[in-house]
Amino acid sequence: MDSKELSNGMKITEIDIPGVYVFETPKYRDKRGTFTVPFNLKEFKEATNFYADFVQDNLSTSKKNVLRGLHYQLKKPQGKLVRVIKGSVQDVIVDIRQKSPTFGKSFSIILSSKNNLSLWVPPGFAHGFLSLSEGTQFFYKVTNDYSPENERTLLWNDPELNINWQTDNPILSEKDVEGKVLKECTLA
């Protein structure tokens, strides 16, 4: 993994799946509290070579052990910049770009309000997270509008993906229970 530090102190690391980046944002403290800059378009573009035209910000609040995902969209794939405002999650992505040398590879990272990390998930990935604390607030920016007719769910515990989730018994939506294994998924 290759890391670089920007002029504002933010560290950016490209993981071993091309196009995926972890951002470590500095948190400045003084007697008044803290201040951080979670996103700067110019620095994001320079670091990722991707112009992110974010169209919407989303915030979900989850109970402990809630697992959301693994979601993706067919015709209108979303890039996502994700972070935790309160609590912590195990964030997981799966490369579903059929022509990618890392197709089917997963990546897992702990994101929390304490470690101040963000993850850039480019279009072409399934994404999900497991809430590790009560009342976790998960914030994410997306590059395409939500498209229910294009949304699909990759089964969270597909044995082929070998994801080491930090629970065996998550709280799931009906949609996520009915996800498909990768070899049965419709991909763009």
List PLM regions with ranges.
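Conserved metal-binding segment of the jelly-roll/cupin
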Residues: 111-134
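Non-catalytic, conserved peripheral segments adjacent to functional cores
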Residues: 2-114, 135, 140-188
